[in-house]
UniProtKB/Swiss-Prot annotation:
It comes from Oryza sativa subsp. japonica (Rice). The gene is SAPK7. It is an enzyme of class 2 (transferase). The active site is at D123. The lineage of its organism: Eukaryota, Viridiplantae, Streptophyta, Embryophyta, Tracheophyta. The keyword ATP-binding applies. Weakly expressed in roots. Expressed in roots of young seedlings. May be phosphorylated. This is Serine/threonine-protein kinase SAPK7.
Length: 359
């Protein structure tokens, strides 16, 4: 525990708070995701850690280790200095087609590897794609909190993910192929990069989940006239946004699509990527902990803290440096969870109404 020092808070997600830390010995920067000890340490957390640990690919954030503090379980990961792809889009408004393709190519290569490892992400979105700090940024997929492994878990049927990115079959409440749903989310990501808006949200009423769901189910989207997008790209999007998952384009087909192959960096070609698909994957794992050690730590973290009194620095020695008038990450997280509850409520209402049916 004493090996790391706190530098700053870097955000809050579905399950915890993230902080930038520095290894005192090596000076390496790492990101730590903190999850409160006790009830929040459930099978989803264990699944996230075990799934993430098994992945070794340059387009996926590296898992390093898990540690337990008096108050939290901390997942230690590679730090991506370039921040979220979402922020880059917000600053740019939208990307050129070439820039969007550059990031989409990397996203697809990372997702392709996850699927090869029998892991579907189930929450792919701009906020879960990070960038390293290099001039030509390398994209890195993160946050495997909703992920499922077909080797370890049943087929998914729960409605998880982020409303704007969710595939029609995920709304069906029946079993679905998580890999095919991931393809849909990749398509939404591509659209947002090109247009600077979500494909199925009503721009005049973006919080109307019922309307968004209706547009998703009826594949109601269009590319604005003021955005120049090539025919090859439009054709690819039309093959991704298909309601019937059996007829949707696959990751393999995307990787062979003419639009995807244009200006494909050498490191993303199938020949260069082949090394990551070998049983003796030589990419560094960075995790010195065995699955057994990890599960033992996770089990320990299921025990709630001895005292309900908050410990400064999430159980580390450093003090929290929160300004009095600023929102704490925990409060931001509660707001996010409230929004998710509202979304789940809306989905249930739509199902109860029988208004939208999947064929």
């Amino acid at each position: 525990m004493e090996r790391y020092e706190l530098l700053k808070d870097i955000g809050a997600g579905n399950f915890g708070v993230a902080r930038l830390m520095r290894n005192k010995e090596t000076k390496e920067l790492v990101a730590m995701k903190y999850i409160p000890r006790g009830l929040k340490i459930d099978e989803n957390v264990a699944r996230e850690i075990i799934n993430h640990r098994s992945l070794r690919h340059p387009n996926i954030i590296r898992f390093k280790e898990v540690v337990v503090t008096p108050t939290h379980l901390a997942i230690v990961m590679e730090y991506a200095a370039g921040g979220e792809l979402f922020d880059r889009i917000c600053n740019a408004g939208r990307f050129s087609e070439d820039e969007a393709r550059y990031f989409f190519q990397q996203l697809i290569c990372g997702v392709s590897y996850c699927h090869f490892m029998q892991i579907c992400h189930r929450d792919l979105k701009l906020e879960n794609t990070l960038l390293d700090g290099s001039p030509a940024p390398r994209l890195k997929i993160c946050d495997f909190g909703y992920s499922k492994s077909s080797l370890l878990h049943s087929k998914p049927k729960s409605t998880v993910g982020t409303p704007a990115y969710i595939a029609p079959e995920v709304l069906s409440r029946r079993e679905y192929d998580g890999k095919t749903a991931d393809v849909w989310s990749c398509g939404v990501t591509l659209y947002v990069m090109l247009v600077g808006a979500y494909p199925f949200e009503d721009p005049d009423d973006p919080k109307n989940f019922r309307k968004t769901i209706g547009r998703i189910m009826s594949i109601q989207y269009k590319i604005p006239e003021y955005v120049h997008v090539s025919q090859d790209c439009r054709q690819l999007l039309s093959r991704i946004f298909v309601a019937n998952p059996a007829k949707r384009i696959t990751i393999r087909e995307i990787r062979n699509h003419p639009w995807f192959l244009k200006n494909l960096p050498r490191e993303l070609t199938e020949a260069a990527q082949a090394m990551y698909y070998k049983k003796d994957n030589s990419a560094p794992t960075y995790s010195v902990q065995s699955v057994e050690e990890i599960m033992k730590i996770v089990e320990e973290a299921r025990t709630p803290p001895r005292s309900s009194t908050p410990v400064a620095g999430f159980g580390w020695q450093e003090e929290d440096e929160q300004e009095d008038n600023s929102k704490k990450p925990e409060e931001e997280q509660e707001e996010e969870e409230d929004a998710e509850d509202e979304y789940d409520k809306q989905v249930k209402q739509v199902h109860a109404s029988g208004e939208f049916q999947l064929s």
